[in-house]
Amino acid sequence: MPVDSIIFDLEDAVALEEKASARAVLVAHLLEGGYGSRSQIIRINGLDTPWAAEDIAAIAEVRPEAVLLPKVDNAQMIAELGAVMDRHEGFENTQIWAMMETPRGILNAAEIADAPRMGGMVMGTNDLAKDLNTRFDPARAPLLAALGHCVLAAKAAGIVIVDGVYNAFKDEAGLQVEASQGRDM
């Protein structure tokens, strides 16, 4: 499938006991290359976890286009990640992207989008829906206000915004509907 960017996940997609090995495998794989002009974005573990510092130190070697920080609530979290990245060689041209997946983060979307080094936002619709205690709705009505708010913040700041994942990956018709909705926003 032709894509512009690939997000590699060291957070939710990796079991706790596999964090170190997943990190090592990812770094080795990315150093082999083979991605052409596709942007490589790496979602690290949250700064409040025991794995974030090791994630950052390890991925500096691959010089990713962006580091994606989960559960961003405010611009201070972006500044904290930037300060940690500045202590390592390899991040001189690396942007920071924010996972927008908490109610507090959504309310602070404009401040987050305007933070230094910000290059993009990724909607964490699953975690956001969980935090909002919403029911599943194929039209995503409970999430539309949050999606729209973040689109406005990202566009005003001139950064990229990416819609959340589609969970029913075998439902191509549903994927098309949700992708069209995301495109139209």
Regions found by a protein language model. Give the residues of each.
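Expand to "…catalyze enediolate/carbanion chemistry for C-C bond making/breaking, isomerization
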Residues: 1-185
